[in-house]
Amino acid sequence: MNVRVLILVPLVGGLLLADDPQSAPDKPTGETRYSLTLTEEGSFAAGLRVPGADAGNLLLLEPTFAYKYGDRWRFSTSLAGLVATKGETHEQVRVRETYVGFTAGDLDLTAGKRILRWGTGYAFTATGILDPPRVATDPTDRLSLNEGREMGEADWVAGKHDFTFVWASAGLLDTHRPGARETTAFRYGVMINGFDTAAIVAHDRGGTTFAGANFTRVFGEAVEIHGELAWREQAAVLLGGKYTLRSGFTVIAEFYTPPNTAYYRPIGMPASVGRRHYGFLRVGKAHLRELPGWKEWDITASLVSNFDDGSRIGVFDAGRRFRNRFHAYLHAQAPGGKRSRSEFGAIPYSALLSIGVTFQM
């Protein structure tokens, strides 16, 4: 633990000094931004059915730094140092993103490790060929632990047309991701009659070719629909929508059906299962009530269901902000289904409760 802290503290100190007004020139041409987030979280698993500790603790330190020089050059990095204790203590430093970019007119060039989001789905994605793995029980990546891929990207905008070409490694400098291959991908985006649409073609080195398309359409201020269609050996389909009530509550619903092929199959799922069908429902509200003491609260409740084996998992999140620096939260999960023959029923606990606090500067 001490080794990781000693590595991160000088880095954070450098970020603070980078914006020292005494070291800045009289007429600065650059813009610097930085932040530091510290999270302490404790968790408890009730009804644990496997050997091991039922309680754990997580300490997470996340510094970010960004520098922009004029309208052309930019640099950004985001790190995550974590110390997890669950019976034993493990330490890790993750490089979430580190990249440099250059802009020349309508052309953007980027090189480095970066997080992309090409899929339009909230809890699932069929076309997010370069996206971090989507987790239906944590679609927002609440602890910000997702990592990007090392890549070179060229993006050119011509009117309402957007052309993006990407080459992504399977882990050029970092360790190779499980099952990842070098990927060459092309994305074409265009707005058609209010539909924000995109077509994507990609090829993995030594693997198969991927083709897909997605769309997003907003109607007024309350309704949004989205969909994805992808083909890699077989078809994967996603349909979803979001509706915002006058009370401020937001409802998100999605239906997702991936084939049971090597690319779409979750780790540990047998090949004999066949095509799967999932449902997702989320109800939430930010600023619970516009009253002192209430508007700092955010709550969400979600349900993920496997329609084939009847298993499901419920998720509840509640959080409260204090003076724009502190955020206390609760995260709970409760799976259900046949323990031996269902996806979510096989999760080895009856409930998981996590309570934490975050400080940001």
Where are these regions (language model features)?
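Outer membrane beta-barrel
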Residues: 66-170, 190, 337
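Residues that define the transmembrane beta-barrel architecture of outer-membrane proteins
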Residues: 53-61, 91-96, 105, 146-150, ...
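Membrane-embedded beta-strand positions of outer-membrane beta-barrel proteins
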Residues: 34-40, 77, 109-111, 154, ...
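Transmembrane beta-strands of outer-membrane beta-barrel pores
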Residues: 40-48, 69, 79-85, 104-106, ...
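Transmembrane beta-strand segments of Gram-negative outer membrane beta-barrel proteins
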Residues: 24-49, 73-77, 161, 299-301
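Outer-membrane beta-barrel "beta-signal"
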Residues: 279-283, 327, 347-361
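Detector for outer-membrane/organellar transmembrane beta-barrel domains
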Residues: 28-34, 192-194, 216-305
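Repeated loop/turn-to-beta-strand initiation elements of outer-membrane beta-barrel proteins
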Residues: 71-75, 106-109, 160-165, 192-199, ...
